[in-house]
Curated annotation (Swiss-Prot):
Lineage, opening ranks: Bacteria, Bacillati, Bacillota, Clostridia, Moorellales
Keyword tags: Cobalamin biosynthesis, Methyltransferase, S-adenosyl-L-methionine, Transferase
EC number of this enzyme: 2.1.1.195
InterPro entries xref list: CbiD, CbiD_sf
Gene Ontology biological process: anaerobic cobalamin biosynthetic process; methylation
SUPFAM superfamilies given in the database record: CbiD-like (SSF111342)
Catalytic activity: Co-precorrin-5B + S-adenosyl-L-methionine = Co-precorrin-6A + S-adenosyl-L-homocysteine
A GO MF term: cobalt-precorrin-5B C1-methyltransferase activity
Name of the featured protein: Cobalt-precorrin-5B C(1)-methyltransferase
Pfam families: CbiD
Organism: Moorella thermoacetica (strain ATCC 39073 / JCM 9320)
Family: Belongs to the CbiD family.
PANTHER family linked: COBALT-PRECORRIN-5B C(1)-METHYLTRANSFERASE
Length: 365
């Protein structure tokens, strides 16, 4: 029996909890030792916190617990310092928080790397505490951030000087190798028991949510793969699944088009090289190929090739190549379609099998 792995909390959750504790100290004089927080999915959690109250400001510190996930930020101290201001809630990045220096990310250039969901979580956590008509400045810092950021993809993404405040659900799902990989397989059994012969394989919860909420794909047919796309494809063959739709962000699934089936960025990250090679084969100029290689995200690549002669059908052909490589992996024993999404959940490209599968489920646009 596979032991259940312990979940942890994102940097965004820790920052929101620390912000709430600092706000309580600043406005109400309460120096709490634990703080209760509601996560984006409605789950209520309680985190231990240390609070220091000064005359004009308050600071709260939460130690990040990543659970059983091998996370570089596990055990780091996330600080939030709160100060009163005339109106509104302002977020600032302090020591160890990276600054976005290149376009294509979810945060504008020049802003601290605090992603949209954590920003909303932080503001929601303190909104009811700040008196009407008044405001507060919140400065988030991670003293070890600059050092730890060198062990992440932030430097390659153009996020300089520190770590990012991340998270979409507030929860860190454990991703330790064999145990976690094995724990994913029962999802297939449950889906088959529900009567599905076609499954959706998606690397993460953002893709899962977009599939369900934006496109109406059946929730019980959606399988989370994390980075183990190849392993789950082979598990589908073993269980005689008939069709699979690979579904997710283009930056993840483009790796499959290059024959990469374990997609963790520490093991394989050739996104730009794969796209550049396929663009060159489609007729891209040398200048465009160089710009693709210099881009940091798929969204940035979209802007590079927008309006080019080869753009029409390019992302569809990339999706088709991912499907072909996946089909080759399982020796043709599975019919595979692929749909590539951007960060907003819009379909960048999909092949004919993906269109057919989505059409069978009532989405035929």
């Amino acid at each position: 029996m596979v032991q259940k792995l312990r979940r942890g909390y994102t940097t965004g959750t820790c920052a929101a909890g620390a912000a709430k504790a600092a706000a309580l100290a600043l406005w109400r004089g309460e120096e709490v030792q634990e703080i209760t927080l509601t996560l984006p999915r409605g789950e209520i959690i309680t985190l231990p916190v240390t609070v220091h109250k000064g005359v004009e400001e308050a600071e709260a510190i939460i130690i990040k617990d990543a659970g059983d996930d091998p996370d570089v930020t596990h055990g780091v101290a996330i600080h939030v310092r709160a100060r009163k201001q005339a109106g509104g809630i302002t977020l600032r990045g302090g020591e160890g928080i990276g600054i976005v220096t290149r376009p294509g990310l979810a945060v504008p250039v020049g802003e601290p790397a605090i992603n949209p969901v954590p920003r909303a979580m932080i503001k929601e956590a303190v909104a009811a505490i700040v008196p009407p008509g008044l405001g507060m400045e919140l400065e988030i810092s991670i003293p070890e951030g600059a050092r730890l950021a060198r062990r992440t993809l932030n430097p390659r993404l153009g996020i300089e000087g520190g770590l990012s405040i991340l998270g979409t659900t507030g929860i860190v799902e454990p991703m330790s190798e064999e145990a976690f990989r094995n724990s994913l397989v029962p999802q297939i059994d449950v889906a088959l028991a529900a009567g599905w012969e076609t499954l959706v394989l998606t690397p993460g919860r953002l893709g899962q949510r977009q599939a369900e909420e934006k496109y109406g794909l059946p929730a019980t047919a959606i399988i989370l793969t994390s980075n183990f796309i190849g392993y789950l494809l082979e598990a589908c063959v073993e269980r005689r699944v008939k069709r699979v739709l690979l579904w997710g962000h283009g930056g993840k699934l483009v790796k499959v088009a290059g024959g990469i089936f374990y997609t963790h960025s520490h093991v394989a990250d050739a996104r730009q090289e794969i796209i550049a090679a396929l663009a060159a084969a489609a007729g891209a100029s040398r200048e465009i190929v160089q710009q693709i290689l210099a881009a940091t995200t798929v969204e940035a690549v979209q802007e590079v090739i927008r309006g080019s002669d080869f753009e029409p059908g390019f992302w569809d052909s990339l999706a088709a190549r991912a499907s072909q490589r996946a089909t080759d992996l399982v020796h043709g024993e599975l019919t595979v379609g692929t749909a590539l999404l951007n960060l907003q959940g819009d379909i960048m490209g999909r092949d004919e099998v993906a269109r057919q599968i989505m059409g069978d489920w009532g989405y035929d646009r």
